[in-house]
């Protein structure tokens, strides 16, 4: 193997390591975003269970609308996490 070929192989290996590291970080971030979303949904569920909210139709309607927004956002976060996990798994298979 020539020096040029060896240098190319080293660069290729370094890029692969950097890509793997970036994918692992993306998975960690996506997982944290899901956890944060779950906490937000749980906190909003507690708010909706208070007498102040459920006894007031306007507040209850606004809370229900916000709850649905939080649930939709959580679903998007789960999809992002799943996509990140799949990308990492594919990269690990091709290693």
Q: Model regions: which residues?
A:
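Charged, heptad-repeat coiled-coil alpha-helices that serve as long linker/dimerization "arms"
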Residues: 1-95
């Amino acid at each position: 193997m020539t020096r040029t070929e060896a240098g190319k192989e080293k660069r290729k290996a370094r890029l692969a390591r950097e890509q793997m590291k970036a994918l692992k970080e993306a998975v960690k971030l996506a997982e944290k975003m899901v956890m944060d979303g779950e906490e937000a949904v749980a906190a909003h569920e507690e708010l909706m269970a208070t007498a102040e909210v459920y006894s007031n139709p306007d507040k209850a309607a606004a809370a229900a609308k916000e709850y649905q927004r939080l649930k939709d956002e959580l679903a998007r976060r789960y999809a992002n996490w799943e996509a990140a996990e799949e990308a990492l798994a594919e990269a690990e298979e091709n290693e």
